[in-house]
């Protein structure tokens, strides 16, 4: 997802997609700020992205800047304690300039979230941590995501967009398949996936 956004914004070429997760490619499973333009920090599955976003949002407030900060996280990485510490800080410092988008597809590299470590009632937890929660039943609906991003933020509250998504949506052999979490398709699979997405 993040590489598609970077390509749409002109930071990288779409031609790079064919090199995803290949040796010496700039497009690895976890974005590398030293190799990929448009990435502010190298983060990964340990939840550092939300902590960095909280720091950026707090810094912007401290400097009096009208800056909005966005963090995109997965539900699997939301099992990390660092995420919850960052959420607690975001609410404590009333970071209404922070939006956290949670891709909630129920799958991660080792299986389903419930098999690995259940997040329980995630909406209730986000509210309890002081977030203005926007829940999207179809997080694959980009119009709904755009509307959620455009929704005004409640003063003094960070915003969480909980997007219930389907991993691999629209590609028959990838949809809801945990094995595709960090795997790049071969040339034949790539062509089939592109054809299915065009239809």
Regions inferred by a protein language model and the residue ranges of each:
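Cofactor-binding active-site loop characterized by glycine-rich and histidine/acidic residues
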Residues: 1-92
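Short acidic, glycine/serine/threonine-rich loops at helix termini
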Residues: 3-4, 32, 82-84, 110-114, ...
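Acidic, glycine-rich active-site loops and adjacent beta-strand->loop/helix elements
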Residues: 23-26, 73-80, 104-108, 139-142, ...
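Conserved thiamine diphosphate
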Residues: 65-67, 114-147, 198
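Generic beta-sheet signal
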Residues: 67-71, 98, 155-163
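Active-site-proximal loop->helix
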Residues: 80, 84-92, 109-128
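A short alpha/beta connector and helix-capping loop motif
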Residues: 80-105, 160-162
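Glycine/aspartate-rich loop-and-adjacent alpha/beta segment that forms the canonical ThDP
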Residues: 131, 139-142, 146-199
């Amino acid at each position: 997802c993040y590489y598609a956004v970077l390509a749409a914004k002109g930071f990288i070429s779409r031609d790079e997609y064919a090199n995803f997760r290949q040796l010496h490619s700039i497009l690895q499973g976890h974005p590398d700020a030293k190799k990929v333009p448009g990435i502010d920090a190298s983060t990964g599955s340990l939840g550092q992205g939300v902590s960095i976003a909280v720091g950026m949002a707090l810094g912007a407030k401290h400097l009096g800047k009208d800056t909005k900060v966005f963090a995109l996280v997965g539900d699997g990485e939301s099992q990390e304690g660092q995420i919850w510490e960052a959420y607690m800080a975001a609410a404590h410092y009333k970071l209404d300039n922070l939006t956290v988008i949670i891709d909630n597809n129920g799958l991660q590299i080792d299986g389903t979230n419930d098999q690995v470590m259940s997040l329980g009632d995630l909406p209730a937890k986000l509210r309890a941590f002081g977030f203005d929660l926007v829940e999207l039943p179809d997080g694959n609906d980009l119009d709904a995501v755009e509307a959620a991003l455009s929704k005004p933020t409640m003063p003094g509250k960070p915003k969480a967009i909980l997007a219930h998504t389907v991993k691999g949506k629209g590609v028959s052999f990838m949809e809801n398949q945990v094995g595709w979490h960090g795997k790049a398709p071969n040339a034949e699979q790539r062509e089939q996936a592109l054809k299915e997405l065009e239809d």
